[in-house]
């Protein structure tokens, strides 16, 4: 039996990059996966041992997000696993931070995450799992990414609180915290930026999206049945040693 056989999973921010890798991995492990994105092409079908249904949803639009979960509840009846990956990261030092930058980042990285979790747990059976995609930025003060780091610290804090609140339902809440990862966004960075980041990673390379997906799968599945309220860094040791 595959790791997520017969599970209903939702990946908010599940198109391309880390989120896309998680959605595809969950489907190949037997889950029926609803993956949201502002750019998703609606449709979907069989993938490996499961099914993948892309859905076009702007997670920062709370009405659209609520409507999406109503559709999932109507079609699938429940959500066994929730992954919240939707987020943005923009450079701005303290002198340059604007209200728009702050609101835009917190609205997607924190507010959307909170209300996705609220909607999902309303139709999640006991024994479900929530995986929040955080970042090692919650633990290190990267110049120019103060607002982003603060949103990821909020993610970490919510995981602790929700793990306590949902424990009576045996719903586990954990964070997977990637370090620099080889995505299309990272590929667009300058060679200098990539080289500088790589030098800070003890393993000497950036992470791969499939490595992040493997960590998310572990936290989503019964393989981590005695883990809740935790953060799993997947950063090549960057923020650990």
Residue ranges: model-predicted function:
Residues 93-94, 98-106, 186, 193-197:
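Substrate-binding pocket helix/loop in short-chain dehydrogenase/reductase
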């Amino acid at each position: 039996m595959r790791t997520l056989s017969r599970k209903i999973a939702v990946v908010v921010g599940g198109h391309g990059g880390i989120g896309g890798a998680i959605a595809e991995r969950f489907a190949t492990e037997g889950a029926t996966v609803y993956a949201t994105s502002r750019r998703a092409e609606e449709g979907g079908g069989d993938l490996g041992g499961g099914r993948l249904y892309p859905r076009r949803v702007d997670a920062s639009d709370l009405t659209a997000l609520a409507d999406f979960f109503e559709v999932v509840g109507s079609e699938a009846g429940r959500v066994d696993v929730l992954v919240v990956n939707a987020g943005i990261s923009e450079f701005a030092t303290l002198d340059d931070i604007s209200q728009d930058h702050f609101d835009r980042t917190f609205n997607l990285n924190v507010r959307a995450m909170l209300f996705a979790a609220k909607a999902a747990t309303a139709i999640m059976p006991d024994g479900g799992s929530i995986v929040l995609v955080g970042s090692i930025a919650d633990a290190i003060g990267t110049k120019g990414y103060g607002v982003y780091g603060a949103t990821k610290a909020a993610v970490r804090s919510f995981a602790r609180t929700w793990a306590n609140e949902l424990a009576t339902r045996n719903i586990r809440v954990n964070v997977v915290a990637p370090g620099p990862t080889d995505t299309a966004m990272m590929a667009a960075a300058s060679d200098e930026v990539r080289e500088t980041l790589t030098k800070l990673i003890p393993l000497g390379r950036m992470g791969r999206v499939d490595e992040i997906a493997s960590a998310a799968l572990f936290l989503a599945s019964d393989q981590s049945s005695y883990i809740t309220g935790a953060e799993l860094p997947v950063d090549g040791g960057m923020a650990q040693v």
